[in-house]
Amino acid sequence: MTILPKKKPPPPPDPEANGERSGSGAPDSHSRSGARPRSSPPPRWAYPGNPSSAAERHTQQVSPPPGSATSGGAGPLGDGALGSCCCCNGAGAGGCCSGPGHSKRRRQVLSAGPGATGNCPDTDDGAGNNSEDEYETAAQTQHLDPDTAEQQELCFEKTLSDKKGFIIKQMKEDGACLFRAVADQVYGDQDMHEVVRKHCMDYLMKNADYFSNYVTEDFTTYINRKRKNNCHGNHIEMQAMAEMYNRPVEVYQYGTEPINTFHGIQKNEDEPIRVSYHRNIHYNSVVNPNKATIGVGLGLPSFKPGYAEQSLMKSAIRTSEESWIEQQMLEDKKRATDWEATNEAIEEQVARESYLQWLRDQEKQARQPRKASATCSSATAAACSGLEEWSGRSPRQRSTAGSPEHPDLHAELCMKPPSPGAPLILGKPPSPCAPGPSNQMSTGADRATSPLVSLYPALECRAIMQHMSPTAFGLKDWDNDEILASVLAASQQEYLDTMKKSTLRRESSPDHS
């Protein structure tokens, strides 16, 4: 009979190995496509300028960390977590403590380690802070001189503005500064911080299987505490918001290059969310004024950053151009109207001056016929008296009066006075240069003293007046009385010519006898 050896009992299960197998096993059912690589938590950055030793920093913390371990490399929560370095306890391994990056598995292992002194339960003393990194930060905040701190802030703002062109927008210091800074760059209004916080906490709860590995306290308690509006934000929330808005989150701290960058799941060309970290307790928004970022990451279809501002600017420019064109057209119309009014005024002035000049000329011409008509009246009266004398004389006297020795008197006797009010129309007087017996017999003195010579200017003026339009004198048309007077004058002239011929015939007959 063969005796079989005793079967060795199976080795006790290693909690660390089980944890590693559970962490590296099948993918979680809650994980999404493009899942994050499971890696050890990232180390945290030590705040520069803190020369205290590891033991001193350990004694200064309000709530001691639950253990320490050397980090295995940079994780998905960024190139490095914010906060000051927390040294190892007991064994003094020379690595940096990863703070809130501790997983539950590592807490269990470290609590059972040789240098561990037991778990220190979390207290509510620092409920307003984040996880263990801000417990430490709150205890290790440097007490700088106010003047030095203000000078440092001013230098930081000036350097960032000169080299990068960025502007630091101050956020309200009420515990929600991180969410205010993100809301300012996503929504354009820091008062939307409550919406950003709610979305961030909901995202953390939906991905609790992943983010719970980087929280040192109960994850539900952590989320409930972070839902309070006065609770500070942490690098875990930054990573969640980077994935939620699919925009990188860059953190600047007294330098022109970001000290930490949190990336989303998918890489794109969207403008990152930039925040600045001040005095280890406050976040502000860092804005690029030359590039629009509001609305990026909200999932709006066909959204173009800054398109609304460009549309408003184009509309404002178009409105301004239209208003300017209308103003110029109005000015041109005003100038054209003034020019037309000036021309009309000039034309009216010229017409008025011309009319006044014409009235003066007419007045002068009217004065000259009056004098001539007075002379004509006296000459007519003399002719009438001569006719009366001629009619009262004897034939001998009449023959004597008609002799060639008195030609002027004979011409005056031949004139018959016109009817009063009727115009006197006579033929044009003979030219002085024309040959004829009358011109040879008359002298210059006789023509000057003859009443017929004085009638010539009046007759010429009257002929000119008859050829003029009646509207020049304010009349619509010539009256019939004028025409009748002209006919009567012509009849009188024929009568005088007949009398003259008969007289000459009578005078010539006695001479022949």
UniProtKB/Swiss-Prot annotation:
Residues 171-177 are annotated as: Cys-loop. Residues 277-282 are annotated as: His-loop. It holds the Pfam family OTU. One of its GO terms (molecular function) is K63-linked deubiquitinase activity. The active site is at D174, C177, H282. GO terms for biological process: negative regulation of canonical Wnt signaling pathway; positive regulation of TORC1 signaling; positive regulation of TORC2 signaling; protein K48-linked deubiquitination; protein K63-linked deubiquitination; proteolysis; regulation of immune response; response to lipopolysaccharide. It catalyses: Thiol-dependent hydrolysis of ester, thioester, amide, peptide and isopeptide bonds formed by the C-terminal Gly of ubiquitin (a 76-residue protein attached to proteins as an intracellular targeting signal). The keyword Protease applies. Its EC number is 3.4.19.12. Signal peptide: none annotated. Residues 226-236 are annotated as: Variable-loop. It comes from the Eukaryota. It is an enzyme of class 3 (hydrolase). Residues 1-75, 99-136, 387-446 are annotated as: Disordered. Keywords: Hydrolase, Protease, Thiol protease, Ubl conjugation pathway. Transmembrane segments: none annotated. InterPro entries: OTU_dom, Papain-like_cys_pep_sf, Peptidase_C85-like. Residues 166-289 form the OTU domain. The keyword Protease applies. Deubiquitinating enzyme that may function as negative regulator of the innate immune system. Has peptidase activity towards 'Lys-48'- and 'Lys-63'-linked polyubiquitin chains. Can also cleave 'Lys-11'-linked ubiquitin chains (in vitro). Belongs to the peptidase C85 family. This is OTU domain-containing protein 5-A. It comes from Xenopus laevis.
